[in-house]
Each structure stands twice: as C-alpha cells, then as structure tokens.
Amino acid sequence: MMGVDIANIITMVLAILFVSTERVTNTLQLSLQLTPNRARYLAAKLCVFLLVTVGVSLVSVCFAALCGRWVLGMMGVELPSLASPEVLQLLGGLLVLGPAHAVLGFACAVTFHSGLLAFLVVFFIMCLPSLASLLPGDLERGVSSLLFMPAIHSLAGTIAPDGVGYTPPALALGVIAVWVVVLCGIAVTSFQRQDL
C-alpha cells in the first residue's frame, strides 16, 4: 500500500499544481475568455484531471497488488484469491483514494488561490482523525465516522467493524461524496466571486 499512498500524494500535489500554475503564468484570464462560464470551465478542468488520476490510481493499485502478492508469496504467506470479497474491497477502496485526494487538492487550490495553503488544508483534512482522537470515546467514534480519511479506510476495509471511525462501506461512500460535493461547491462559489 505504500506505493499507492505515494501515488496518491503525487496526484494530490499535481492537482494543486494543475490549478495554481494557471495563476502564476497568468493564463487563467485567457482560459476564461475562451470559456466564460466559470463553473463549466472548472468542471471540464476537473474532469480532465480526474481521467488522468483514475488511470494513475488503476496502474498504482494493480502494480502494488501484484508486487505485494509476489513478495508475500516468496515469503511463503498463504494469500487469499484476488477475487475474494476482502481483496476486492481493499482494491476498490484504494482506487477511490487517489481521485478523492485529487479532488480535495483541486478544490482547495481553487478556493485558496495558493498551492501551499491548499496542500496544508488537505493535509489538515487528512489529520482530522488524529485530532478527533482527543475527544472522549463515543464522541470520538461519532465525529470520526463523519471524517474523510476514516471513510476512505472503511471503504477499503482497513478499519475493523468495531474500530473507531468505522462506517459501513455504502455509508462511507456517501461520506466521501458529501466531502467532495461540499468542497467542490465552495470552490465553484469562490471561483465565481473572484475578480480576475
């Protein structure tokens, strides 16, 4: 999974750079002259980047799965079938991880006009479960189940059903969708109000 995590961090940083370089190179005004509808412009830009991110996630997850199976097989570890529900859940969750991080990076870069600030905000979102762990037991469980990272890990099956932050996979997908929709909504609203 380390390779997948590295690929996800790279795609998140690339999403931030994908947005912020237009500001630095002053090509944003030209792009908006060609596509005056700002919401459509952002949606098209996000779709292009998501296609690339899905491809990168697919390659990194397949590569990590095959390399992991090869290494563990050489060590004599008995491995479950790739078609087993647990493995499919893990691979599916890992496939969602890259595009979800890319959308967070993209939305934060649009909202905050700064690549560094966008990275820090996404990093803060990723660290929220650690902050939630400071809360008392039941409150921690409740808050953690609404956070982005525990939802991703629940979707991938890496949190035990009785673990802190666990959300059933279908509900976890909903939590991820809410985070993405809210952050993208904030980004579109912010972008439409900007004086460029």
Stretches with model-predicted labels:
Residues L66-E78, T111, G115, L135-V143, ...:
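Membrane-interface elements of multi-pass transporters and channels
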